[in-house]
């Protein structure tokens, strides 16, 4: 995935926006790309059939992080232990780099190696839905609205928010293999929905218990802002128990494979 993204950004203009794009896609856990490749492997597809889709979801994810870090959004100055894009360059460059990474994601989905035209259209439609006003963007909008809400979010509201902001792209990533193979998406969708929520709960737990030097980002933001989280609503032990239950649910969804 790393080399595919590097290749996609070669032979581009020697401009700050291109340097910022390369900076933004470097590093990270590659969870979403991993889900794309593993889902395809599980359904018997070779890596080259899914590689451009894996790079696409990572480019899309990188765009979302660049924009989320902006002062008008989450106002973060540290990401993966390094200065965020708007800090290293400036806000305008960060906005443009994010925009360009988003369009790069859809450019990558035109790769003929992904399959027929219908398959690629399904991938484009799926990524657009997961990242737009029904998915990730909706989740971020709900998150911003919660900052000025008169009452803290309920558990159901936080679950809905995170299903969009974090979960939608994770779900799409897991479903890519089924789209490529023409297989049933439902088991992978159930798996990823549970995994995505467990991932977010783990992130909330790390915000309370983690080490900034290891996580590479500023911690305790939610507590300082008085933002409701899974930990603030369930308690630390309750959040851990909920995450463990979701992991078991995710594993059960894959029992048929």
Could you describe each region identified by the protein language model?
Residues 3:
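Glycine/alanine-rich phosphate-binding loops at beta-alpha junctions
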Residues 6, 10-251:
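Mg2+-dependent prenyl diphosphate-binding active-site environment of isoprenoid biosynthetic enzymes
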Residues 257:
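Short arginine-rich
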């Amino acid at each position: 995935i790393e080399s595919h993204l590097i290749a996609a950004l070669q032979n581009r203009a020697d401009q700050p926006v291109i340097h910022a794009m390369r900076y933004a896609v470097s590093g990270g856990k590659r969870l979403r790309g991993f889900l794309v490749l593993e889902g395809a492997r599980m359904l018997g597809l070779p890596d080259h059939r899914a590689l451009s889709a894996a790079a696409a979801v990572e480019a899309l994810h990188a765009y979302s992080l660049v924009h989320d870090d902006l002062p008008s959004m989450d106002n973060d100055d540290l990401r993966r232990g390094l200065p965020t894009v708007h800090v290293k360059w400036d806000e305008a460059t960060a906005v443009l780099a994010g925009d360009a990474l988003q369009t790069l994601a859809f450019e990558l989905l035109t790769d003929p190696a992904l399959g027929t035209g219908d398959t690629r259209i399904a991938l484009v439609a799926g990524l657009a839905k997961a990242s737009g006003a029904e998915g990730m963007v909706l989740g971020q909008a709900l998150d911003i609205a919660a900052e000025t809400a008169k009452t803290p979010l309920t558990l159901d509201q936080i679950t809905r928010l995170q299903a969009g902001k974090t979960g939608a792209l994770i779900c799409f990533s897991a479903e890519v293999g089924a789209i490529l193979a023409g297989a049933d998406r439902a088991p992978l969708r159930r798996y990823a929905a549970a995994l995505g929520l467990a991932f977010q709960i783990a992130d909330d737990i790390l915000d309370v218990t983690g080490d900034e030097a290891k996580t590479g980002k500023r911690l305790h933001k939610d507590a300082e802002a008085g933002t409701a989280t899974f930990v603030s609503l369930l308690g630390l032990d309750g959040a851990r128990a909920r995450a463990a239950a979701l992991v078991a649910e995710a594993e059960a969804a894959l029992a048929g494979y």
